[in-house]
């Protein structure tokens, strides 16, 4: 029986400066780290980290997702990011703090939340 060839893990290097996109909705948070052209290096979400239902939109879930995403990108060589934050949900600040704590320097934070100029009617308020 022939020996199986063991494939080396491919090490991909990226440039040191990139972008971090944090999409925070009322139900989930999605974090993507990309290079300067916008090609995604690593991504994570609260659902990917194992949180379910209402636990996905907590600051702790955002922290865990950001930690997972930032570790992979840091190992690939990403060191500085411009953060683009979109959405009204919880965990926006905790995700930014976690990315900074993982060794990736945050150069600037830009809020790109889409605001309607009196477009669609919003959903009715909940009565709990």
UniProtKB/Swiss-Prot annotation:
Keywords: Ribonucleoprotein, Ribosomal protein, RNA-binding, rRNA-binding
The keyword Ribosomal protein is assigned to this record: yes
Recorded GO CC terms: ribonucleoprotein complex; ribosome
Transport listed as a keyword: no
Cited InterPro entries: Ribosomal_uS11, Ribosomal_uS11_bac-type, Ribosomal_uS11_CS, Ribosomal_uS11_sf
GO MF terms, alphabetically ordered: rRNA binding; structural constituent of ribosome
Gene3D superfamilies: Ribosomal protein S11
Superkingdom assignment: Bacteria
GO biological process, one term: translation
Pfam families: Ribosomal_S11
NCBIfam families assigned: PRK05309.1, uS11_bact
Assembly: Part of the 30S ribosomal subunit. Interacts with proteins S7 and S18. Binds to IF-3.
Family listed: Belongs to the universal ribosomal protein uS11 family.
UniProt function note: Located on the platform of the 30S subunit, it bridges several disparate RNA helices of the 16S rRNA. Forms part of the Shine-Dalgarno cleft in the 70S ribosome.
Identification of the protein by name: Small ribosomal subunit protein uS11
